Amino acid sequence: MKTKVFLGLILSAAVTACLCRPAAKAPGGSHRPTSSLARRDWPEPPSQEQQQRFISRFLPHVFAELSDRKGFVQGNGAVEALHDHFYPDWMDFGRRSTEDAADAA
């Protein structure tokens, strides 16, 4: 019993010593190219000019994504076709009630 406790303490001390050391850097320094779009090494917040440049660069893309009519929320015919193929006997009650209302009109 004492041997197991002693080995456990030695093992935990060795693991703690290995985990506390800083990671060694690889020789040659694997340099990742920094992206001009995402800079996380700024010492201070971006200036007003930089904010305006980022906004003017990304705002059209955001508007294009938001105005896209083929979104998941509005439904997709391909998804409905797959659903009908894999679940032929399952009835969506919301869809059934809208179909019944359309048939009654």
From Swiss-Prot:
Keywords: Amidation, Cleavage on pair of basic residues, Digestion, Hormone, Secreted, Signal, Sulfation
Entry keyword annotation includes Electron transport: no
Principal cellular location given in the protein's record: secreted
Keyword set includes Phosphoprotein: no
Name this polypeptide is given: Gastrin/cholecystokinin-like peptide
Function: Potent stimulus of gastric acid, but not of pancreatic secretion.
GO biological process, one term: digestion
Residues modified as Sulfotyrosine: 87
Top-rank taxon: Eukaryota
Gene Ontology cellular-component annotations: extracellular region
Region (Disordered): 24-51
